[in-house]
A protein has these predicted regions:
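Metal-dependent amide/peptide-bond hydrolase catalytic core
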Residues: 1-151
């Protein structure tokens, strides 16, 4: 029987309060199980990133912009992912939104998940991504380019 054990994992959530609660619970459960067995537990939490939290107002603004510049594009409102991104730090400081431009293309065999060894993306999605990003910026910096005026 080994004298010590090491467990490692990742804690992710959609809200910072939930991450704090999970950290507290992991610590309490670990220490109490160890104490019940006559051992000690040391819990170290290294937070790598914050949750990515989009601003609802920015989301709605960009939704209108994207529908105006690319009316045929499918906008999925309910998609959630526990992305671990540097973007979370920007969104904590400034209202913004983090969005994906899908590129799956089953006809070309380009529909594997991001962490799959055969993942690749269809470069044909790049022009749409550029168009959406340019329209997003334009809606904030060009006079008259607000969503109800984008052509």
């Amino acid at each position: 029987i080994p004298a010590s054990a090491r467990l490692r994992g990742t804690i992710r959530a959609f809200r910072s309060e939930v991450i704090a609660l999970l950290e507290e619970r992991v610590r309490a459960i670990s220490e109490n199980i160890a104490a019940a067995l006559g051992c000690t537990a040391e819990v170290t939490v290294e937070q790598v990133t914050l949750p990515v939290v989009n601003d609802a107002g920015v989301n709605e603004r960009l939704r209108a912009v994207f529908q105006a510049v690319a009316p045929g594009v499918q906008l999925i409102r309910s998609f959630q992912t526990m992305a671990a991104e540097d973007m979370s730090y920007f969104l904590e400081a400034v209202p913004g939104t983090f969005f994906f431009v899908g590129s799956a293309n089953p006809e070309c065999g380009l529909d594997y998940a991001h962490h799959h060894p055969r993942f690749d993306f269809d470069e044909a999605a790049i022009p749409l991504a550029v168009e959406l990003l340019a329209a997003a910026v334009a809606s904030y910096v060009l006079p008259g380019a607000q969503p109800d005026h984008v052509e």
